[in-house]
Amino acid sequence: MNKQDFYFDLPSELIAQYPLANRSDSRLLIYNRQTEEYGHYQFREIADFLQPGDLLVMNDSKVIPARLYGHKATGGKVELLVERITGDFTFLAHIKASKSLKSNDLIYLDAGKRLEVLQRQDDLFLCKACENILDLLNDLGHIPLPPYIAREDESLDKERYQTVYAKCAGSVAAPTAGLHFDDAVLSSIRARGVNIAYVTLHVGAGTFRPVRCERIQDHKMHSEWFTVSPDLCTAVKAAKSMGNRVIAVGTTALRSLESAAMGGELIPCSRDTDIFIYPGYQFKVCDGLITNFHLPESTLVMLVSAFIGHQECMALYQEAIDKRYRFFSYGDASLLL
């Protein structure tokens, strides 16, 4: 298949620039693969469409304030986006500067703090902080809003560009399907008899990398670190053995589960994955998916197409556009069953 097979015309005013006042005020478009029927609801109603014994798998990765601003000794401006923390003081980062940096260069931050460039690694730079990097980011870092949100980060983003169940720091972009869940929705889901388990996948900046190849099969996915625990494997196997559904909350949770089952059986693991899911892929674990509405020609639209069918995906997205759903990270959600 070609990249343009996944193109759709999205009016710019449908790209959500801010979150709604309340997380669960988001709209919810539900699609059933068996009946090919869909319906329009509010996200707070989602428990009504889940069944006792269903297992929701959520990504508990926490967004870090990964964007830093500084300057070189010459005064030239430098912008960093932390891609991955590799140690207490070391990290890999994308760096924007008027002139490329080299080993041993220093980057000066506010409050008298500084970073040292250790070496270049492909498109990234290995750097060392003057203190614990997470502490430094919490002091000086900015929330790394996606490129399609055309504004600077604000104080509200520290709370709202984060799931209420985020626990493991490491993502530079939110697992956005989880942004709609608030405590009331989680309580209603548990009261329904639905089980919840967690995976961890640290979302990298590569999630926004466009597909440049005409043939989608030629696209090389970015790599991200994920962990599937023994407890999660046990929960998934228990649900499957009872004939219950495993529903991934977000494409990151789905990609983690499918990566851990590449050998045919879900096994505990903690490693990198660059799994690319597009039409023709045979799903091994996931029976349902909760996900936002994604960019045209993106790998995430290709994943949704693999899950519900290409024509069905394009029709569903056109329905969302016609009904004025809000798109992308701060937008509305879909439940695909």
From Swiss-Prot:
Q: Which InterPro entries match?
A: QueA, QueA_dom1, QueA_dom2, QueA_sf
Recorded superkingdom: Bacteria
Query: Which GO molecular function, any one, fits this protein according to its record?
Result: S-adenosylmethionine:tRNA ribosyltransferase-isomerase activity
What's one Pfam family the UniProt record gives for this protein?
Queuosine_synth
Which terms under GO biological process does the entry name?
A: queuosine biosynthetic process; tRNA wobble guanine modification
EC number(s) per entry? 2.4.99.17
Pathway(s) of this molecule:
tRNA modification; tRNA-queuosine biosynthesis
Keyword Cytoplasm present in the record's keywords: the answer is yes
Q: Where in the cell is it found?
A: Cytoplasm
- What's the protein called, per UniProt? S-adenosylmethionine:tRNA ribosyltransferase-isomerase
Question: From what organism does this protein derive?
Answer: Legionella pneumophila subsp. pneumophila (strain Philadelphia 1 / ATCC 33152 / DSM 7513)
